Amino acid sequence: MTQKHPQTLVVDAPLSDAERLKRESNFLRGTIAEDLNDGLTGGFNGDNSTLIRFHGMYQQDDRDIRAERAEEKLEPRYAMMLRCRLPGGIISPEQWLKMDSFASEKTLYGSIRLTNRQTFQFHGILKKDLKTVHHLLHESGLDSLATANDVNRNVLCTSNPVESDLHAEAYEWAKKISEHLLPQTHAYAEIWLDQEKLATTDQEPILGATYLPRKFKTTVVIPPQNDVDIYANDLNFIAISENDQLVGFNVLIGGGLSITIGDKTTHPGVAKDIGYIEKEKVLAVAEAVVTTQRDWGNRSNRKNARLRYTLERVGLDVFKAEVEKRAGVTFEASRPFTLTGRGDRFGWVKGIDNQWHLTLFVENGRLLDYPHRPLKSGIAEIAKVHKGDFRLTANQNLIVAGVSEEDKDTIEKIARDHGLLENISELRKNSMACVSFPTCPLAMAEAERFLPNFLTKVEAVMTKYDIADEYIVFRTTGCPNNCGRSLLAEIGLVGRAIGRYNLYIGGDRVGTRIPRLFRENITEDEILSEVDSLIGRWAKERDGKEAFGDFVVRAGIVKAVTDPAIDFYD
């Protein structure tokens, strides 16, 4: 990253309207409670439709029928998407069964969507059922606070069931970080849980009265796995162990993938290393990074408000020095670590505690009862007999964790009977798509509904070139916000319009390199033609087991992106 001498630590420009909204919200209350009682509309009005995001919900409508309803002079079919706060992705079978019942009985789509941020979403909750789901979450020991908007989002932690002791400690740090950085406002409890308003004035000592300039994403990773995609997140703690004991963390800051097509002041970025800390300093450092971004981040232009842009504006060293000052730490030189891959370990693996763990592939995270493949019911049936826990992965899959030797056969039979243990190609296992249509209001092209059939065609190409057992990290996202993390894939598709995508190639398998734009605004047939040609060359010309992304760079098909702030658009 190019170091700059800061002209000013704070952007001197008029604040965006989002800042007005937060300032006037009375610590995220707005008039949400009044809107809940408005039976004339299925949605929330004005600022409230944005404020509910801080409470973990997005107002959406079914875009498949939007035009039809408009012709009939009806408002869109508004329904809410709710995202649970689940640091580290661990949920008990008892909790899961309650969530499963709600999805079946109280949502328009009857599904549970696993996300690539290790949690789950309900799509299609009617306004009248919102308090029901929040009470259900609360009674189950869960909530949805701060899973969206300008706060620290759900904290990720490597899904590592094998090294159980190390994972347990890393997971506890993920939970502690999540709790430490949560909003302190009582608004969530007042509005959704009917708790009485406190006589004291709300305080937000970490996030501040207007919260953060933009979303903020945090991870804890246990090398060599990079399933949580550390380089795509604002704040990352890389676990360093000695003699199988956690001793501290390397800290990386400033990753992010969202861009705005046509605006070259926006670009993706990979997180940068700022040094090593002892584990006891984690919360102090997390707070210092967040508060420095709170104070220095761009509150004028939301497109340039993420931490990576703050680092570019003030300089990485300046930001690091401020974090050291606020946290009362001095970063040591980073400890060496190695990343070997991002994929999940499917099937049964045995942990050092002699417990078994079964990782199940859930295509694009959608748990639904399909004809002949009742996936959602299968997980529920497993939950009824499972004595361990479930772990949701950052690849949108699910681990049945902590299975005893005597329970293995029972769990496996349920999974197999419900289509949860089918033979899946390596390509498909390493794929990912965001939700996109019909529920996402930002979607420009299909993603989740597009990728499965398209991958079938790519699998045929792999078979044609006799490399069906190989894989490419292949991701699709419906818009440039990049929720599907396409801009850290070997092949990434970014939606531009219905049936059209930008094609990016040249990322690496472990997730350290941004891919480059190869073809712009092309159709599915054109994408398949390009991919066929590229895979053909890779199969023929690669160096041994050279990965696809590394090959297209070495062969000169695209130039590697080395510093996205400078050369992403070259």
Curated annotation (Swiss-Prot):
Family, per entry: Belongs to the nitrite and sulfite reductase 4Fe-4S domain family.
Organism domain of life: Bacteria
Protein name per Swiss-Prot or TrEMBL: Sulfite reductase [NADPH] hemoprotein beta-component
Enzyme Commission no: 1.8.1.2
Metabolic or biological pathway, per its Swiss-Prot or TrEMBL entry: Sulfur metabolism; hydrogen sulfide biosynthesis; hydrogen sulfide from sulfite (NADPH route): step 1/1
Coiled-coil blocks: none
Ligand binding (siroheme): 483
GO biological process: cysteine biosynthetic process; hydrogen sulfide biosynthetic process; sulfate assimilation
SUPFAM superfamilies, per database record: Nitrite and sulphite reductase 4Fe-4S domain-like, Nitrite/Sulfite reductase N-terminal domain-like
Residues that coordinate or bind [4Fe-4S] cluster: 434, 440, 479, 483
PROSITE patterns xrefs: NIR_SIR
Family annotation (Pfam families): NIR_SIR, NIR_SIR_ferr
Function: Component of the sulfite reductase complex that catalyzes the 6-electron reduction of sulfite to sulfide. This is one of several activities required for the biosynthesis of L-cysteine from sulfate.
Cofactor(s) it depends on: siroheme; [4Fe-4S] cluster
Reactions catalysed, as given in the entry: hydrogen sulfide + 3 NADP(+) + 3 H2O = sulfite + 3 NADPH + 4 H(+)
